[in-house]
Amino acid sequence: MNIMITLFINMSLASLLVLIAFWLPQLNTYTEKSSPYECGFDPMGSARLPFSMKFFLVAITFLLFDLEIALLLPLPWATQANTMTPMLTTALVLILLLALGLAYEWLQKGLEWNE
């Protein structure tokens, strides 16, 4: 019963915060707000340069493998449990999934910098 009350309170607060976030912003846009700010000077050229998709893909790949490290960090503490089978199974499935993702990324030439 306590868990149901906790879930209800969490969902209510989350919904309330989402509603407040949609209600509060003022969408007044004008040229000063939408122009880039460069230390008080007018920009010499276009301040909105196109972003290379390669950098974006490398950043996303880095974040995925960084998440792997974050998920595997609790493993030393999990080894102190009486039954290690669920922990080892989960860890091996996670590592296998990420290794398959890395192999797929490699085969699709997503890790090569030259085009």
From Swiss-Prot:
Subcellular location: Mitochondrion inner membrane
A Gene Ontology BP annotation from the UniProt entry: mitochondrial electron transport, NADH to ubiquinone
Reactions it catalyzes: a ubiquinone + NADH + 5 H(+)(in) = a ubiquinol + NAD(+) + 4 H(+)(out)
EC category name: translocase
Transmembrane segments: 3-23, 55-75, 87-107
EC number: 7.1.1.2
Pfam families: Oxidored_q4
GO cellular component, one term: mitochondrial inner membrane
Family: Belongs to the complex I subunit 3 family.
Summary of the function given for this chain in its UniProt record: Core subunit of the mitochondrial membrane respiratory chain NADH dehydrogenase (Complex I) which catalyzes electron transfer from NADH through the respiratory chain, using ubiquinone as an electron acceptor. Essential for the catalytic activity of complex I.
Annotated protein name in UniProt: NADH-ubiquinone oxidoreductase chain 3
Species this protein is from: Dasypus novemcinctus
